[in-house]
From Swiss-Prot:
Belongs to the TRAFAC class translation factor GTPase superfamily. Classic translation factor GTPase family. IF-2 subfamily. The gene is infB. Residues 488-492 are annotated as: G2. This is Translation initiation factor IF-2. Residues 58-102, 166-186, 353-371 have a biased composition (Basic and acidic residues).
Length: 956
């Protein structure tokens, strides 16, 4: 069994790391022929041959994978290592910040009000030494009055000092008795280092400045507190010690130096900030005390930055962040103050509230206007061109957006509500559908399960032009439709009902394959259950084939591929399947899920099997509908018949349509007067999945419109009237007027032309296709304006409109009615008639090219060399020349060339041979030439004769 095993060649290629060409060529050299197809299969023996030959490639691939894996691991290891280093740095930084924050917290807590006041008193007498803040604590119990006097002399602080001293006495007692409490309170610990330094240094400083302060020795008992804060001293000691080495008895007391720098601490107190080192919160003594010492204190503080400045910074940063509630309260109070609430009269309050209400109303109106500018009001099924005009964006961008969403559209193709919303949202617009109330007025009755019966499938035949769509339907219907079609191509949707030999029914829609009928193909895909894509086996996957496939996929319709013309000698169905596989469309023969069948529409080969596959697909879909209700469906096509009036081809999808029903389709309404099938036979009723032609509507409904049947004629007329009004409003909104930018562009272009066209056709789909194709022909230099299009014969109104707007009239399968022809002859209006869309497009393109200004091209006719110069009075200089090349014409323009440089460009006055005027002189003959307005000629100058030729410009 292992020998029988087969392997797909694409799997082998991946495993051996070789290309398809190498594998095929090598096996071919070995005498083994296989298809150059990645989905082909090979046996184990063939695989072994390839493996033995290309084992090295496989090894190289594995080696490259290993190298790549090693590099990846190295990069990953480096990345992890870098992340680890960054994380370590971050943690170290966080720990350092936490330590600083702890110190700051102590400094903040260390700001009891009592200690701050104590520091201020001694500092004022001693302007130089930082021991003074300690002295403030010492005079607590000794002499409050003595400290006041020196303070008053230096700065006016006597008043705050007295209460400070009394407070300090209170502080001393708990500090001395309970050292544990001091430890618990970080504020006291921050203060006590300063106090411990002060006792000895204070005595010396006081002795120098004021003898009265000598009594401060009593506060030496606070040395115990300073021992508490030795860790803080350790940080500051190294830098403070060198500053004041000469203080006796203060060897340990680096705090003295510390205090020296500490003088900067008052500086933050000056603006009212708390003093971190001393912890003095009261603001009055601090600012006064700082004034004399500000200069020295700043320098000292800068030198001791690592020590004391850090102590100062916490004091500033230590401000407690206000809570959210406090912030809200503060904002409210500020607003109340600004608005003056509470202090004004009721009348003022009333006026203020009135102004506020008016301002709020104005803001709301402005906001509504701004939002409204981004909201577009549309009816459902607006064309791509109309939505582009409403949003003021180029049509190409809208089409590009639709294509990016997987929707193939053209400029005149109408979009449904969902697509409109998505496209508008891409450009930042909101869509408001103004027909919602109308749609809601049409009641939709939900069907019960027991009322549903199986219905025939609706099948759309799509594909490229001339690939055999209509021929396939001909064979199925046993009727030659192609013979009656212009140019052998379908130019509108044909709807046919077919009953097979086994009694089963299928409704077929035949869509055009020409590129102009994109919208008609899309419409066919929207109303269908199954799509048959016809592809010629002797051709390729053409653009319209791809377009039809995309339409079917967008509509979510099952696809069946019919590969036609397999009876031709150059047919290659496998090539078509290969191309489909390249588009990610695998047919069943190639292991996919999409059905396909090889047929010949001409001989009928495979058509029966194709229909069986259609019925199988329909059985899987389980198509059901309720025939016992008011009919609903879609308008497939509409046209004006000379004898019958407006005829609409419709496809009933739900319910049953009967003669006498009142029908509404788009903005048109009317009673069903007669119904016919595709062969012209009268039909009394039309059930689900039945295509019929209906007489009775008051106009040509737009293809793709939904139709509904109403019991109340009045209700249908009201809805039709409302729809007409909305469509008129929309046509006004989408009417594009010329802008200043466009005028400027046309002036800059210089030769801008416009071609106005009035388009009339026999069916709505053909008019739509022609309009779309004509609009695509517009260029920057020539623009086509379709000022009116419609279904029906050319009328006098059309001729008058063409006369007023200087337009041409194009009739597609229609002729002038009544006196329209005579009026057109009188007004000299050009009317063109066409029955093939190709011819209409080509003629219009030629007309546009004729409107373009021709390009002028110079052609050199000949050259003549001046051999002699004759000067004649009252005439000027005559050049005696010999024609050296070509010929010189009397009417040609000339250039005088001297030493390869053009010195004059002009015209001839006279061309003579001997004494006779001649029209031309050919090569080898001499002649006399007089140049208009130029006598500065010299011997050996060359006269070059040329003329300008107008070349017809082509459309870009």
């Amino acid at each position: 069994m292992s020998e029988e095993r087969v392997i797909r060649i694409n799997k082998v290629l991946r495993e051996l790391n070789i290309s398809l060409e190498r594998a095929v060529d090598y096996l071919k050299d070995k005498g083994i022929a296989i298809d150059a197809n990645p989905n082909a299969k090979i046996s184990d023996s063939e695989f072994n041959i390839l493996q033995s030959q290309f084992a090295g490639d496989k090894g190289n691939k594995e080696a490259s994978k290993e190298v790549g894996e090693e590099k990846r691991k190295e990069k990953e290891a480096l990345r992890v290592e870098r992340e680890k280093e960054i994380e370590d740095k971050r943690r170290q930084e966080e720990e350092r910040q936490k330590q600083q924050e702890i110190i700051k917290a102590r400094a903040v807590v260390s700001g009891p009000v009592q200690v701050g006041k104590i520091d201020l008193n001694p500092k004022k007498p001693a302007a130089v030494s930082p021991e003074e803040p300690v002295k403030a604590e010492e005079p607590k119990t000794v002499t409050p009055t003595q400290t006041e006097k020196p303070v008053q002399k230096e700065t006016v602080q006597s008043e705050p000092v007295a209460p400070v001293v009394s407070e300090e006495k209170k502080v001393e007692k708990p500090i001395i008795t309970e050292k544990k409490e001091v430890k618990a309170e970080s504020s006291k610990t921050a203060q006590e280092p300063i106090i411990s330094t002060d006792p000895t240094t204070a005595e010396e400083t006081i002795t120098t400045q004021y003898q009265k302060l000598s009594g401060t020795t009593l506060t030496g008992q606070t040395i115990d507190l300073s021992q508490f804060n030795k860790p803080k001293k350790k940080k500051e000691d190294p830098k403070i010690t060198p500053n004041k080495p000469g203080t006796p008895g203060v060897g340990n007391n680096n705090n003295a130096n510390k205090n020296k720098r500490k003088r900067i601490a008052p500086k933050p107190g000056t603006p009212g900030a708390p003093k971190p080192a001393t912890g003095n919160a009261p603001g009055t003594p601090n600012p006064n005390k700082i004034t004399p010492n500000s200069g020295g204190g700043f320098n000292a503080n800068r030198n001791a930055r690592p020590g004391f400045v850090k102590g100062n910074r916490p004091a500033i940063v230590a401000k407690v962040e206000p809570t959210e509630e406090e912030v809200k309260n503060q904002i409210r109070e500020t607003l109340e103050k600004l608005q003056g609430k509470g202090g004004k009269s009721k009348a003022a309050k009333y006026r203020r509230d009135k102004r506020e209400t008016h301002r709020q109303k104005s803001d709301d109106e402005q906001r509504a206007l701004d939002e409204g500018s981004k909201t577009i009001k549309v009816t459902e099924f607006v064309t791509v061109g109309e939505i582009a005009i409403m949003m003021d964006v180029p049509i190409t961008k809208v089409i590009g957006t639709c294509m990016s969403l997987g929707i193939m559209v053209t400029m005149n193709q109408r979009l449904d509500a969902e697509t409109l919303t998505i496209v508008a949202d891409e450009f930042g617009y909101d869509v408001e559908f103004i027909t919602v109330d109308i749609e809601e007025a049409i009641e939709v009755v939900e069907d019960r399960e027991e009322d549903l019966v199986t219905r025939a499938p609706i099948v759309t035949v799509m594909g490229h032009v001339d690939h055999g769509k209509t021929s396939l339907l001909d064979y199925i219907r046993k009727e030659n439709v192609i013979a009656g079609e212009s140019g052998g191509i379908t130019q509108h949707i044909g709807a046919y009902g077919v009953t097979l030999d086994n009694g089963q029914k299928i409704a077929f829609l035949d869509t055009p394959g020409h590129e102009a009928f994109t919208a008609m193909r899309a419409r066919g895909a929207q109303v269908t259950d199954i799509a048959i894509i016809v592809i010629a086996a002797d051709d390729d996957i053409m653009p319209q084939t791809k377009e039809a496939i995309s339409h079917a996929q967008a509509a979510g319709v099952p696809i069946i591929f019919a590969i036609n013309k397999v009876d031709k000698p150059n047919a290659n169905p496998d090539k078509i399947k290969e191309r489909l596989a390249g588009m990610n469309l695998l047919v069943e023969d190639w292991g996919g899920k999409i059905q396909s069948h090889d047929i010949s529409a001409k001989t009928g080969l495979g058509v029966k099997e194709l229909l069986e596959k259609v019925l199988l697909e329909a059985e899987i879909l389980d198509l059901k509908s309720n025939p016992n209700k008011a009919a609903q469906g879609t308008v497939v096509e509409a046209y004006l018949d000379k004898g019958k009036g407006y005829v609409s081809t419709i496809l009933v999808q739900h319910g049953t349509l009967k003669i006498g029903d009142y029908m509404l389709a788009g903005k048109h309404h009317g009673k069903v007067k007669a119904m016919h099938d595709e062969r012209g036979h009268t039909v009394l009723t039309a059930g689900p999945s039945t295509p019929v032609s209906v007489l009775g509507l008051d106009g040509a409904a737009t293809a793709g419109d939904k139709f509904n049947v109403f019991e109340d004629e009045k209700e249908a007329k009201q809805i039709a009237s409302k729809r007409s009004q909305l469509m008129r409003e929309q046509s006004v909104r989408t009417q594009r007027h010329i802008t200043l930018d466009e005028i400027g562009r046309r002036i800059a272009l210089g030769q801008f032309k416009e071609l106005n066209v009035i388009l009339k056709g026999d069916v709505d789909g053909s008019v739509e296709a022609l309009s779309d194709s004509f609009s695509k022909l517009s260029t920057e230099e020539v623009q086509i304006n379709i000022i009116h299009k419609g279904v029906g014969a050319i009328t006098e109104t059309d001729v008058n409109l063409a006369s007023a707007s200087d337009a041409i009239i194009i009739g597609f399968n229609v002729r002038p009615a009544g006196n329209a022809r005579q009026l057109a002859d009188k007004e000299e209006i050009d009317i063109r008639y066409y029955s093939i869309i190709y011819a209409a497009i080509d003629d219009l393109k030629d007309a546009m090219e004729g409107m373009l200004a021709p390009e002028m091209k110079e052609e050199v006719l000949g050259t003549a060399e001046i051999r002699e110069i004759f000067k004649i009075s009252k005439v000027g200089s005559i050049a005696g020349c010999m024609v050296t090349d070509g010929k010189i014409l009397r009417t040609s323009k000339i250039r005088v060339i001297r030493d390869g440089v053009v010195v004059h460009t002009g015209e001839l006055v006279a061309l003579k041979r001997f004494k006779d005027d001649v029209k031309e002189v050919t090569k080898g003959y001499d002649c006399g030439i007089q140049i208009k307005g130029f006598n500065d000629i010299e011997i050996s100058d060359v006269i070059e004769a040329y003329h300008e030729v107008a070349i017809k410009k082509k459309l870009k």
